[in-house]
């Protein structure tokens, strides 16, 4: 473990130059070592988050307590128009990589062009592309957590100027190609932003996003590859990050389409932003092979058509959205990044109050179907039957969440956050759990 920490430090010491401090400490680690003769710059930084949380629920307990929720070492190196960045996480007592990418920038007559390759966030979703260190909330919304793609191995092209931003790329389904069965699927994702107002005093942007993913990895059952899409979120908290209350599994998922819209408005002392996303999932399976595999068993059917009627397969659609706002009582003005089309975090001594509402829709229920808690499944036409009993309903849960928070930054390196979140859950599986109260605090420092 020690060698992973010492290697970037030794690399930094090997470079000659002076140590300076960067202004955007979240995106650029602050310890800089420069070699002007070679036009080379190396940075190293770290980030640590410690959370404490108290939970109150109607029936099923949630584990209150404290936890290390983020602990990272971050490094970067720039040479002329080339930039390399990597950060590594140790928060769960083990080493894991986060962002690792190489980027080439080219200044053009109409703006900046960037070419990016490595392991990083799919561009879809403004919230998911905002670093946790720049968030004005302890957690992203449950909506963004449940539906947004995470980091993926890919290639991207980015263009931006004062009024436009475009980020699109192609990505692999599995960064290690270590899936149990199947081959690498792929996805295409993009986010496009127009900034009709963008100056030192205020910024207003409107954006759109699209993603297509082809799922090609899974497990083999009866000599047939079974793909699956898993979605879920915690109760907008990290201390007990269980997704038991809000989650869904979509067997035989094949094609995933995400279409979204966003807005952002900020002045020196106020910001508001929000997103809406629609997700549609189509499914595919080898019915003939599964029908033949069941012949002669208790699950056998007389014909393929009767098997298909007893085992229907349908598409699913979901929706999610959030809106959040903040007011700065004192401190440096809110800042906006043209290169990322994102709101930056607090910088220097500051105090702010924030609020958010989010909706996460993981229910896609067929009218008339009945849920039986003892069997944890839905039954077609409201009829409880042992055979057949295949349902098209997805009961992952719908949740409304409202958050109020106060954030105080001592300086550009240390910050405390306090928030209260009320979650209202509607899920048949947890019929006695409707109300979840979350009171949590965070101590964060980074350099």
Where in this protein do the model-derived segments appear?
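Hydrophobic alpha-helical membrane context
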Residues: 14-15, 82, 287
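Outer-membrane beta-barrel and related beta-rich outer-membrane complex signature
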Residues: 127-131, 180, 216-225, 284-288, ...
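Extended ligand-binding clefts on enzyme/binding-domain cores
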Residues: 202-243, 248-252
């Amino acid at each position: 473990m020690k060698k992973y920490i010492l290697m970037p430090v030794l690399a930094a010491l090997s470079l000659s130059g002076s140590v300076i401090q960067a202004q955007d400490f979240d995106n650029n680690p602050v310890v800089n070592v420069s070699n002007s003769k070679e036009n080379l710059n190396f940075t190293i930084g770290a980030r640590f988050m410690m959370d404490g949380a108290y939970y109150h629920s109607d029936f099923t307990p949630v584990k209150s307590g404290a936890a290390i929720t983020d602990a990272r070492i971050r490094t970067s190196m720039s040479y002329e128009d080339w930039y390399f960045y990597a950060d590594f996480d140790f928060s769960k007592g083990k080493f894991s990589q986060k962002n690792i990418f190489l980027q080439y920038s080219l200044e053009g007559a109409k703006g900046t062009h960037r070419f990016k390759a490595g392991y990083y966030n799919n561009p879809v979703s403004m919230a998911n592309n905002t670093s946790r260190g720049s968030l004005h909330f302890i957690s992203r919304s449950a909506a963004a957590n449940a539906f947004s793609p995470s980091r993926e191995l890919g290639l991207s092209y980015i263009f931006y100027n004062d009024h436009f931003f475009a980020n699109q790329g192609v990505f692999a389904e599995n960064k290690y190609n270590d899936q149990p069965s199947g081959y690498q699927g792929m996805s295409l994702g993009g986010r496009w932003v127009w900034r009709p107002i963008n100056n030192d005093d205020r910024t207003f942007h409107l954006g759109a996003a699209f993603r297509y993913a082809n799922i090609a990895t899974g497990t083999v059952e009866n000599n047939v590859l079974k793909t699956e899409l898993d979605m879920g979120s915690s109760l907008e908290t990290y201390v007990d990050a269980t997704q038991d209350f809000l989650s869904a599994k979509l067997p035989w998922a094949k094609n995933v389409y995400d279409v979204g819209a966003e807005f952002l408005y900020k002045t020196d002392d106020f910001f508001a932003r929000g997103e809406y996303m629609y997700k549609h999932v189509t499914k595919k399976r080898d019915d003939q092979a599964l029908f033949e595999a069941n012949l002669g068993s208790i699950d056998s059917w007389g014909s393929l058509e009767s098997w298909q009627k007893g085992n229907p397969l349908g598409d699913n659609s979901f929706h999610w959205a959030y809106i959040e706002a903040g007011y700065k009582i004192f401190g440096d003005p809110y800042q906006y990044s043209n290169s990322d089309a994102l709101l930056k975090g607090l910088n220097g001594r500051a105090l702010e109050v924030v609020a958010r509402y989010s909706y996460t829709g993981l229910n896609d229920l067929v009218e008339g179907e009945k849920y039986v808690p003892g069997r944890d499944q839905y039954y077609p036409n409201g009829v409880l039957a042992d055979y057949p009993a295949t349902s098209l309903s997805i009961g992952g849960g719908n949740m409304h969440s409202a958050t109020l928070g106060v954030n105080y930054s001592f300086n550009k390196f240390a910050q405390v956050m306090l928030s209260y979140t009320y979650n209202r859950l509607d899920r048949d599986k947890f019929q006695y759990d409707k109300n979840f109260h979350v009171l949590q605090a965070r101590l964060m420092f980074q350099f």
